[in-house]
Amino acid sequence: ENTVSHEVQRLTVTDLDAPNSPAWRATYRIVGGDNGDHFTITTDPESNQGILTTQKGLDFEAKTQHTLYVEVINEVPFVVKLPTSTATVVVLVEDVNEPPVFVPPSKVIEIQEGISTGEPICAYTARDPDKGSQKISYHILRDPAGWLAMDPDSGQVTAAGVLDREDEQFVRNNIYEVMVLATDDGSPPTTGTGTLLLTLMDINDHGPVPEPRQITICNQSPVPQVLNITDKDLSPHTAPFQAQLTHDSDVYWTAEVNEKGDAVALSLKKFLKQGEYDVHLSLSDHGNKEQLTVIRATVCDCHGNMVTCRDPWTWGFLLPILGAALALLLLLLVLLFLVRKKRKIKEPLLLPEDDTRDNVFYYGEEGGGEEDQDYDITQLHRGLEARPEVVLRNDVAPSFIPTPMYRPRPANPDEIGNFIIENLKAANTDPTAPPYDSLLVFDYEGSGSDAASLSSLTSSTSDQDQDYNYLNEWGSRFKKLADMYGGGQDD
């Protein structure tokens, strides 16, 4: 049963006419017994047999046997009238396990959205078309949102989640579609499908919300920003809407609903510095369903509707960076000034009193004779061996020069000339030598004298023992002394 285009039987005929001629080819037709047009018969062109097939599915439970009457004639009518040949065909229907059938195949149920979990919705069952009693079990094949549950024995459908009519992902035109299965315990088991269509009725479960939720406004002569109000619910749970500012947002902002009640104008009523602020806007619909929405408002330093915001990074971060850069630059300038000033003020390499060039020495002579000053005789004999103290300087880069080798003072007086020339060359390359271009060498008078010859004057206890005539040879600067002492005896 339930098989379409199934070959039931082949009918064979005998014809003495020439094979494959029109007088030989047979034509078959069913003349009785097929009230439901379940069968059809055609001719095999090769064997000239009649092929009986089903063109509809046979139902064992409706009819177990079909008796058909088949007639056969030639394509070419007989020349003389002859009786036609007929055959009786009995078709027995074989019973097979048929799937359960839901009644009706598609079931429409109206139910209110938002019902509680576990609340019953409907019972959706199927019948078994077979004559034998078989047990049928039920389960859900496709439930996109997972909102339903089905009892496997009774087929009772209950709510397993919150049914939301406004869920556009799963609900189309207020209808939520679910597919269920019914399976029997036959051999082999068969399954039937059914469709459950839930028409969700609206309740006031959504509050109104404004769009957009981000605005930009000037803090000088601000232009009100219009926000459209939307509500997913159906009338009468929609407009007119009401607006109210909460969380102290009404201190700086105002919210007014238009005449139609489907939009709200948000405006700044007090000056605010540039920045981002949260405005708490509460909207309620005609059914007093309230919804709080936080509007993100960007306030700019501008006028009217010329909304332009400078990048806050420029002033919030650039100014401190510039200040730090200027402070660093000022510090560098101060350090540079101190370094240059330190370079200009240098300590003299020799104290002024140490410079004995072109100076007249006063020996404190008061008439009775000169008082010898205390000199370090050992320094006069050391000559070039008396090396000056090294002066540290920070205005020039250090250079590495090998220390010159000075020749020791010879014992032979005849070698004193070579001694001076060689040590002069060494002193010219000595970085520790005094910064003078001449070598100071005192006249050496021999080792027998305890005092070097500082002058030709000899010590005496009286002015009469001294001769001052040599002062006339010293020039005009000593003329007065020459007059005072040179001619004193004649007076």
Swiss-Prot record:
One Gene Ontology CC term in the entry: cytoplasm
PROSITE patterns reported in the protein's UniProt record: CADHERIN_1, CADHERIN_2
Ranges in the topological domain labelled Extracellular: 1-316
Subcellular location field: Cell membrane
Residues in compartment: Cytoplasmic: 340-491
Pfam families referenced in this protein's UniProt entry, alphabetically: CADH_Y-type_LIR, Cadherin
CDD domains registered for this protein in UniProt: Cadherin_repeat
Entry's Gene Ontology BP terms: adherens junction organization; calcium-dependent cell-cell adhesion via plasma membrane cell adhesion molecules; cell migration; cell morphogenesis; cell-cell adhesion mediated by cadherin; cell-cell junction assembly; homophilic cell adhesion via plasma membrane adhesion molecules
Major localization listed first in the record, in broad terms: membrane
Role description: Cadherins are calcium-dependent cell adhesion proteins. They preferentially interact with themselves in a homophilic manner in connecting cells; cadherins may thus contribute to the sorting of heterogeneous cell types.
Name the record gives this protein: Cadherin-3
Species this protein is from: Bos taurus (Bovine)
Gene: CDH3
